[in-house]
Amino acid sequence: MATKEFYFAIIGHCDQPIFEMDFPVGEKKTKESEGTRHLNHYIGHAALDIVDEHALTTSQMYLKMVDKFNEWYVSAFVTASRIRFIMLHTHRADEGIKQFFQEMYETYIKHAMNPFYEIDDVIESPAFEQKATLYGRKYLS
């Protein structure tokens, strides 16, 4: 059975990633995984236009699977402030991804309410990363 792989990114208003994480967390990084990371960036950014089109046609925040590239599915979540959450995944896990997005949205809102955080700044908070890891293990495994 192939391993389940996930790549999560929060994309800001100017299409720049403000947070990224690979799941499963803790895997050893190899040259091949670095190449995969670059491919994930490409796939995620290529899907942004499709995400924006879907966001205009629905009032739902969770957009489910919006695109597929080779073995990677792309799911998305658009916040009320138009910050995009992108999830690349090799296995269909719609309910788990939806729950993960909802938990990360709540975590992002709490982080964004910090008076020292500027919207669209890169998120470098260890607490935010720990929450993402926790929710990834809880909902994506």
Swiss-Prot record:
GO cellular component terms attached to this protein's record: cytoplasm; endoplasmic reticulum; Golgi apparatus; nucleus; perinuclear region of cytoplasm; TRAPP complex
UniProt keyword annotations, A-Z: Cytoplasm, Endoplasmic reticulum, ER-Golgi transport, Golgi apparatus, Transport
A GO biological-process term: endoplasmic reticulum to Golgi vesicle-mediated transport
Main location: cytoplasm
Record gene name: sedl-1
Alphabetical list of InterPro entries matching this protein: Longin-like_dom_sf, Sedlin
Function: May play a role in vesicular transport from endoplasmic reticulum to Golgi. Required for the systemic spread of the RNAi response.
Protein name: Probable trafficking protein particle complex subunit 2
Domain of life: Eukaryota
Lineage: Eukaryota, Metazoa, Ecdysozoa, Nematoda, Chromadorea
Organism the protein comes from: Caenorhabditis elegans
